[in-house]
Amino acid sequence: MTEPWNEIAEWWVETVRDDPRDSTDLLELLDELIGGTGGLTLDLGCGEGQVMRHVGAPIVGTDISGRLLTVAADAGPVVRASLPWLGWVRPDSFDRAVCIGVVEMVKDHRRLFSEVSTVVRPGGHLLVAMNHPVSTVPDSEPLVDESGAILWRWGDYLESGSLAQHVDGHEVVLYHRSMGALLEAAATAGWRLEQLIERGPSARTVARFPEYEGQEQIPTILGCRWTRDR
């Protein structure tokens, strides 16, 4: 997995800069979740450091791509590692973890929630902003009925699955889990849900991608804030 992410690092940096769904919209969602938290922060899947720069020090980033970490290192210390493994971190050493646009790229979400609960201290926080599960279902898509209303084809929403995107000959996979599956996995790992936010396409996104017009009430991003109970 490491080599593909290194090969498409430049594509990813440009995507983050150009697409409000991967940048401004998710950062604004993070801002709604982050209030009342603080301290030493772990940025999970930090990529080129967008979130590290937004949140500010003290923060440590981790990612699988050495090329992306070269850019992120300007924002703070970084560690090259493959999620969900966090064995390089001492237990209870972080006050909070942020995971922006990454949960859906990790195949083993249960292990991710479990590993993060080990490295964040009791009472600490996990802040997640991600593609909404409605939008990651294979074969899900908008539909227009006879009246012109835009509806949504759910596909096999309750079944776990994956979507593959091909970039310059490399495969980027998004893993689909239902909302219930995500929340159950987090709760099992000792995370207590404090806040959940759903958002449709922003005006900024609709202006950039006009095909989203009329879909503003269909959720595209999800934000969750958890506290570690144990």
Where does each model-flagged region fall?
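Conserved class I S-adenosyl-L-methionine
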Residues: 1-37, 50-54, 68-71, 126-161, 200
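Class I SAM-dependent methyltransferase SAM/SAH-binding core
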Residues: 42-86
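A short acidic, Gly/Pro-enriched loop at the edge of an enzyme's catalytic core
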Residues: 86-97
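A short SAM/SAH-binding and catalytic strip from SAM-dependent methyltransferases
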Residues: 96-109
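A short glycine-rich, Lys/Arg-flanked "PGG" loop and its adjoining helix->strand segment in the class I
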Residues: 110-125
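Short alpha-helix
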Residues: 162, 173-196
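C-terminal lobe and adjacent flexible extensions of AdoMet/dcAdoMet transferase-like proteins
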Residues: 185-230
